Swiss-Prot record:
Domain of life of the organism encoding this protein: Bacteria
Subunit structure comment from the entry: Homodimer.
GO molecular function, one term: serine-type endopeptidase activity
Name used for this protein in its record: LexA repressor
Function: Represses a number of genes involved in the response to DNA damage (SOS response), including recA and lexA. In the presence of single-stranded DNA, RecA interacts with LexA causing an autocatalytic cleavage which disrupts the DNA-binding part of LexA, leading to derepression of the SOS regulon and eventually DNA repair.
Record flagged with keyword Transcription: yes
Keywords: Autocatalytic cleavage, DNA damage, DNA repair, DNA replication, DNA-binding, Hydrolase, Repressor, SOS response, Transcription, Transcription regulation
Entry-linked Pfam families: LexA_DNA_bind, Peptidase_S24
Organism (species): Shewanella sp. (strain MR-4)
Top EC class for this record: hydrolase
HAMAP family, per database record: LexA
Organism lineage: Bacteria, Pseudomonadati, Pseudomonadota, Gammaproteobacteria, Alteromonadales
Assigned EC number: 3.4.21.88
Chain residues forming the annotated DNA-binding region: 28-48
Active site: 123, 160
Length: 206
């Protein structure tokens, strides 16, 4: 690898630190602000130079389209696992479901988070859980009425507000366009995978 200028080394360290702390690379504007550049274009020129030297990879079309080469990534199984598509009948934390690990301190959430789940759809938008968010989840097996849970119903995983009435469970959306999911425990399978304890959006805790 060709040697870096002091400014390039500073930017590379900022990128690594941002990924370690938030799980996301910084935007060009964030780099410019933190390092005192007059514009995001100045940051872009330095990023192109870093890419030419093989220190980073630039993915066009997105403000956070910066990634470290594989050898630069922290591939250790530390931090919070991000759960992707969940296979029927498999534990949600099975290794094959883990897309990657985010360097996020679990104690930032209360109670502490055990894993992250990428939100799909807008059924919980009225309480600020949006498509593409990373939902921080504390693993439990039981829930109280009113809690927002990650539930598995007949092997479909969903995020909803929990309500139990006798042998019936209602999983309520926070969007008037969606009807509650009704689960009759006498013949349907319901597993509580965890409680929603926070949201990460664009690298920020909400």
């Amino acid at each position: 690898m060709r040697p870096l200028t002091p400014r390039q080394a500073e930017i590379l360290e900022l990128i690594k630190r941002n990924i370690a702390e938030t799980g996301m690379p910084p935007t060009r504007a964030e780099i410019a602000t933190r390092l005192g550049f007059k514009s995001a274009n100045a940051a872009e020129e330095h990023l192109k130079a870093l890419a030419k030297k093989g220190c980073i990879e630039i993915m066009p079309g997105t403000s956070r389209g910066i990634r470290l080469p594989v050898e630069e990534e922290d591939n250790s199984e530390s931090g919070l696992p991000l759960i992707g598509q969940v296979a029927a009948g498999e534990p949600i934390l099975a290794q094959e479901h883990v897309e990657q690990y985010y360097q996020v301190d679990p104690s930032m959430f209360h109670p502490a988070a055990d894993f992250l789940l990428r939100v799909r759809g807008d059924s919980m938008k009225n309480i600020g859980i949006l498509e593409g968010d990373l939902l921080a989840v504390h693993k439990v097996q039981q829930a109280r009425n009113g809690q927002v849970v990650v539930a598995r119903v007949d092997d479909d995983v969903t995020v909803k507000r929990f309500e139990k009435k006798g042998n019936l469970v209602y999983l309520h959306a926070e969007n008037e366009d969606y009807s509650p999911i009704k689960v009759d425990l006498s013949f349907q399978s319901l597993t509580i995978e965890g409680l929603a304890v926070g949201v990460i959006r664009n690298g920020d805790w909400l």
